[in-house]
Amino acid sequence: MPRPVLSVTAFCHRLGKRESKRSFMGNSSNSWSHASFPKLELGLGQRPSPPRESPTCSICLERLREPISLDCGHDFCIRCFSTHRIPGCELPCCPECRKICKQKKGLRSLGERMKLLPQRPLPPALQETCAVRAERLLLVRINASGGLILRMGAINRCLKHPLARDTPVCLLAVLGEQHSGKSFLLDHLLRGLPGLESGDSTRPRAEGSLPGIRWGANGLTRGIWMWSHPFLLGKEGKKVAVFLVDTGDVMSPELSRETRVKLCALTMMLSSYQILNTSQELKDTDLGYLEMFVHVAEVMGKHYGMVPIQHLDLLVRDSSHHNKSGQGHVGDILQKLSGKYPKVQELLLGKRARCYLLPAPERQWVNKGQASPGGNTEDDFSHHFRAYISDVLSTAPQHAKSRCQGYWSEGRAMARGDRRLLTGQQLAQEIKNLSGWMGKSGPSFSSPDEMAAQLHDLRKVEAAKKEFEEYVRQQDIATKRIFSALRVLPDTMRNLLSTQKDAILARHGVALLCKEREQTLEALEAELQAEAKAFMDSYTMRFCGHLAAVGGAVGAGLMGLAGGVVGAGMAAAALAAEAGMVAAGAAVGATGAAVVGGGVGAGLAATVGCMEKEEDERVQGGDREPLLQEE
């Protein structure tokens, strides 16, 4: 096939372009090929920089005009390609590589070019993060009868998120009655977290600036809710995963007292920074709930080794005392209490709680930011409210969920960084342990003191089980060897276990506090008895096996000794017949002894010796037969 002829102008133009590129970029083995596309980096980091050069035509080396692309990968202007196309050729021939290929109008799509690039898979953490959509999840549901249903799947989805699984967590929980503005507060906290996480701004963004990120307000607030996506805040190397938690209607008077106590316990486990949101004034119901919550938190903290109240904000909205400082308002509250709520007084006198007073908002500001008659929408409420949101979000990383000091002597697992800080995975395990206790069909409780008594008894029961398990393990180790096991008969071992069981029940039973002490002891005794029976079954089989092995070895030795003595006597009697025959019998007997044991060998030697003696007597008597017989 003849080569197409390039015009002099096109050839000089092309040569000049290539020579200028050589002088600027240096020699290249592929300098005559068309300019390649810029490399695309796949990832989730910064956006790729724009290409330095636009795609050029392989003929005129100019920017492509009305481009076409061939299957071989070369791109041309439609005018240049038509000029240099070989006439009479049905399929177009590429002027660059001389291959016959199909013609496509326009450049190859970006997807086709990306398929040619080496694909780098994303890290597993980023893959899981991108695959999960952030939303509000129900963690604790209250059914129609008032019972609680803990959804461990939702809890694991939140706390075992790739960004929170091995990271200290801060759970920012908003408490308060229904229709007290909790959803409004949560919505602004949620819209302020992404900007603070990215470092763009520490102020909450305007309404509608973050589509899809909104807490929302509806009537389905029964239970405890959590935003599924954590936000990483704090300095580099000390990041904390911050979650938002809505306690729903845990303060509802319609719930039973036992349900409210359990909800307080779960709220304590699912929060490290609490905000008690109330309107106008702190009412007696608010203080009563706060007293119960602090009491339950202390009980749970003592049992699980966690700090009961790490930080608590009293947020009073629509306050008529907005000109007074929060500390001054706390002083007024303490004067009114007069010893009625001792735990609340102790909390307010310390440094773990603070009070914020917010004035009533203007109606125009509440109605989606419409301007006030004076034209000033930044009223006192919005100014103080935005300042409070910024303060909460900036200090949240300082209040990650943590354990009490000195609790690590019990051998708990160590967290990353500060070993007192709980990671998301560790907190999920603690909540699972709590749900296991709450799910047991035990006596009910209607006060924090009764709950404390049950947790105390639970701790004693677990200690008794561990003590008995350790005793059984020591007995198992001590009787592993044959002769150690044979010293302790099964009946003796059964008596040892029974004595130890009775001693443990007597020692730990005295320390039980609940009224149902007898039922608890009966259940504990049944569990210990079942464990003892399981060990005795395996121990009896082991003892019988050891005894059979030792008996077989001793029996074989005794039988071999007796057979040897008898065989020696018979061989001595056979010596009177013929020394050669006896020697042969002894040799056969020795071989038999080597194969089947001393007893069988000795017996075989004696038998052969007797047979040879009888044959010798028969020959001497004249009863001789020919070696060969004829018919």
From Swiss-Prot:
EC number: 2.3.2.27
Protein name according to UniProt: RING finger protein 112
Keywords: Cell projection, Cytoplasm, Cytoplasmic vesicle, Endosome, GTP-binding, Membrane, Metal-binding, Neurogenesis, Nucleotide-binding, Nucleus, Synapse, Transferase, Transmembrane, Transmembrane helix, Ubl conjugation, Ubl conjugation pathway, Zinc, Zinc-finger
Expressed in which tissues: Predominantly expressed in brain.
Segments for region (Interaction with ZBTB16): 131-631
Quaternary data: Self-associates. Interacts with SP1 in an oxidative stress-regulated manner. Interacts with SIGMAR1 in an oxidative stress-regulated manner. Interacts with ZBTB16 (via C2H2-type zinc finger domains 1 and 2).
Membrane topology reported for the UniProt record: Multi-pass membrane protein; Peripheral membrane protein
Reported function: E3 ubiquitin-protein ligase that plays an important role in neuronal differentiation, including neurogenesis and gliogenesis, during brain development. During embryonic development initiates neuronal differentiation by inducing cell cycle arrest at the G0/G1 phase through up-regulation of cell-cycle regulatory proteins. Plays a role not only in the fetal period during the development of the nervous system, but also in the adult brain, where it is involved in the maintenance of neural functions and protection of the nervous tissue cells from oxidative stress-induced damage.
CDD domains xref list: GBP, RING-HC_RNF112
GO BP: any one term: response to hydroperoxide
Subcellular location: Membrane; Cytoplasm; Nucleus; Nucleus, Nuclear body
Gene: Rnf112
Matches recorded under Gene3D superfamilies: P-loop containing nucleotide triphosphate hydrolases, Zinc/RING finger domain, C3HC4 (zinc finger)
SMART domains: RING
Highest taxon of the lineage: Eukaryota
Catalyzed reaction equations: S-ubiquitinyl-[E2 ubiquitin-conjugating enzyme]-L-cysteine + [acceptor protein]-L-lysine = [E2 ubiquitin-conjugating enzyme]-L-cysteine + N(6)-ubiquitinyl-[acceptor protein]-L-lysine
PTM annotation: Auto-ubiquitinated.
Listed InterPro entries: G_GB1_RHD3_dom, Guanylate-bd_N, P-loop_NTPase, Znf_C3HC4_RING-type, Znf_RING, Znf_RING/FYVE/PHD
Single GO molecular function: GTPase activity
Pathway: Protein modification; protein ubiquitination
Zn-finger region bounds: RING-type: 57-98
Gene Ontology CC annotations of this record: cell body; cytoplasm; endosome; membrane; neuron projection; nuclear body; nucleoplasm; nucleus
UniProt entry tagged with the keyword Transferase: yes
